């Protein structure tokens, strides 16, 4: 994009970066139809629907 001089060593990093400029969000939540530019953001979002909390404190278990 004009004015962007970012460079990447891996093509997937460039692909992910291009989405910032295009606004392309190819990952969609099947529950609420919200779209995300990254699959890891969708995975985290889905937990808002399921209530899943996969990370617990080793000290107190919460």
UniProtKB/Swiss-Prot annotation:
Location(s), subcellular: Nucleus
Job of this protein: Sequence-specific DNA-binding transcription factor. Plays a role in hindbrain segmentation by regulating the expression of a subset of homeobox containing genes and in Schwann cell myelination by regulating the expression of genes involved in the formation and maintenance of myelin. Binds to two EGR2-consensus sites EGR2A (5'-CTGTAGGAG-3') and EGR2B (5'-ATGTAGGTG-3') in the HOXB3 enhancer and promotes HOXB3 transcriptional activation. Binds to specific DNA sites located in the promoter region of HOXA4, HOXB2 and ERBB2. E3 SUMO-protein ligase helping SUMO1 conjugation to its coregulators NAB1 and NAB2, whose sumoylation down-regulates EGR2 transcriptional activity.
Protein name: E3 SUMO-protein ligase EGR2
PANTHER family for this protein: E3 SUMO-PROTEIN LIGASE EGR2 (PTHR23235:SF54), KRUEPPEL-LIKE TRANSCRIPTION FACTOR (PTHR23235)
Involved pathway(s): Protein modification; protein sumoylation
KW ATP-binding (keyword) present: no
InterPro entries in alphabetical order: Znf_C2H2_sf, Znf_C2H2_type
Species in which this protein is naturally found: Cerdocyon thous
């Amino acid at each position: 994009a004009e004015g962007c001089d970012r460079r990447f060593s891996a093509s997937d990093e460039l692909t992910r970066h291009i989405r910032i400029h295009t606004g392309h969000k190819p990952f969609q939540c099947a529950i609420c139809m919200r779209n995300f530019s990254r699959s890891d953001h969708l995975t985290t979002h889905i937990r808002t629907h399921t209530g899943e909390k996969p990370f617990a404190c080793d000290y107190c278990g919460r």
